Amino acid sequence: MSRPKLEVADIFRRHGAAWRTANKAHLSLGQRRVMTAIEVCRTAALGGHVERCEECAHTRIAYNSCRNRHCPKCQWPAAAAWLAAREAELLPVPYFHIVFTLPAPISAIAYHNKPSVYGLLFAAAAETLTTIAADCKHLGADIGVTAVLHSWGQNLQHHPHVHCIVPGGGISPDGKRWIACRPGFFLPVRVLSRLFRRLFLQGLEAMHAVGELQFFTDLATLKDAHEFRAYLAPLRTTEWVVYAKKPFAGPKQVLAYLARYTHRVAIANSRLLDLDQIHVSFRWKDYRESGCHKSKVMRLDVGEFMAFPAPRAAERFPPHSPLRPLRQHLSRRQAGALSKPTRCALCPDGSP
């Protein structure tokens, strides 16, 4: 695979040291480690190793990778290992994809309270799905959920949302049988949206009551309980975005989807377009456009771009998974191998 003409590492090497000096009072140790890891990834600073093709004996020297979870060049091996573990949890049933998104006013609070609010986002989304699924009016079953947090959008703006992968059914209340949902339909989105709104706001108010939330700059007045309630008041009646995408065809499609999302970094090197002394330009898709997603170009200040590294905790976990007792009763369909070794370009047959 050819090297992109511009990489995140190039931007960090060129502007990182000056930016860290200018922002040293605001940078966490984790952010510094992420930037340093990306800067030295696959350079002599990390040493190297010799790779030898078993077919033609061609050898080459390769520099070692940083293996940091936020590095655009190091995520496939980590994703493969994570997916291998998740493969054992999949069932031979259709899977659904449901997205829970926080409104912009809540995102503003989340920006300075990431561990607390992101944890609440996971918990509220999981409780919403399991509560509605357990209701006999809808499914009447105990379901499993795998959730993945994204704290940014395609344009690198703060946009917390959780992607939930849910099997199309669950275990009966007595734990003895599988209850399947209707073909092509899992749970009503409007019902999910309203319960999610209520659970999240209740949790946020509880955090505020015990002083768990911090407020700065334009939101500093929200430290006052009355101001906080007034800030949340309009959000109690607006529709929160809960989006149900088309169901997956089966476990293979679930794995293919998870491969793109579980270890996703803020921006892939392939999306970068240009860099100068002041700005970085990159491609992004505007998912608010109806029909096909419109590709656009975003131009950010270099300093704003370099602030992208995600939080080091509360990124992804399966919040609710009661399916293990049932797996022994269900036939398993094995997913294909995650990856195969690739021959070098000098082999007579370069294909795997």
Task: Outline where the language-model segments fall.
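Beta->alpha loop/short-helix hinge microenvironment recognizer with preference
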Residues: 1-352
